[in-house]
């Protein structure tokens, strides 16, 4: 069996392992680009949380569509690089093309990789849709399709245009 034939199995196991709909997102404390602390409790909700990496080809393909949704809906998209080599400078440079995304960066308390581990993320990109109570409504391992993401935002209580 080739390594590519195992990919669906890995994705299924990853989805089974990750936070599930109905579960509260874990506590974290990361910094926004201005140095303000963002926690699970303080983030604006409903929201979308995307775990990504600068080298990830699926992330590169997906981000323009996600950014359009962020622009159209006004829903906050928090993006967290789970890649240890993605420094603050790399993340902020990458995010210049996506001004509606709010990148979250390492703080004195947490590193993005630690937060990804609490969400039980096993790859890139992983997208979580969170409702006003901070509970996961939907998660996507890999690309999040536009219609599915908009449906999840409606389930999260988002007031879409």
Question: Where are the regions a protein language model picked out?
Answer:
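Bacterial N-terminal signal peptides that target proteins for export
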Residues: 1-7
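Bacterial N-terminal signal peptides
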Residues: 7-14
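N-terminal "domain-start" segment that seeds a small globular fold
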Residues: 14-40, 102-103
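Short loop/turn microsegments at loop-to-beta-strand junctions
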Residues: 25-26, 46-47, 124-126
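Short active-site neighborhood of thiol/selenol oxidoreductases, capturing the structured segment around
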Residues: 39-57
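Structural microenvironment flanking redox-active thiols in thiol-disulfide oxidoreductases
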Residues: 60-98, 108-115
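Short, internal strand/loop/helix patches
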Residues: 95-133
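Thiol-/selenol-based redox modules, centered on thioredoxin-like
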Residues: 126-161
């Amino acid at each position: 069996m080739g390594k590519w034939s195992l990919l669906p199995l890995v994705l299924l196991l990853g989805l089974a392992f990750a936070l599930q709909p109905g579960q509260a997102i874990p506590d974290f404390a990361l910094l926004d680009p201005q140095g303000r602390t963002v926690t699970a409790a303080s983030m604006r909700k409903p929201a979308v949380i995307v775990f990504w990496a600068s080298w990830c080809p699926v992330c590169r393909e997906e981000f323009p569509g996600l950014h359009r949704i962020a622009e159209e809906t006004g829903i906050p998209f928090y993006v967290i690089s789970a890649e240890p080599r993605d420094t603050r400078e790399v993340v902020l440079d990458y995010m210049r093309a996506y001004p509606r995304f709010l990148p979250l960066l390492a703080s004195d308390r947490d590193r993005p990789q630690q937060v990804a581990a609490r969400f039980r993320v096993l790859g890139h990109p992983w997208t979580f849709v969170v409702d006003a109570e901070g509970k996961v409504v939907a998660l996507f391992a890999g690309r999040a399709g536009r219609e599915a993401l908009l449906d999840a935002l409606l389930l999260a209580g988002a007031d879409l245009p």
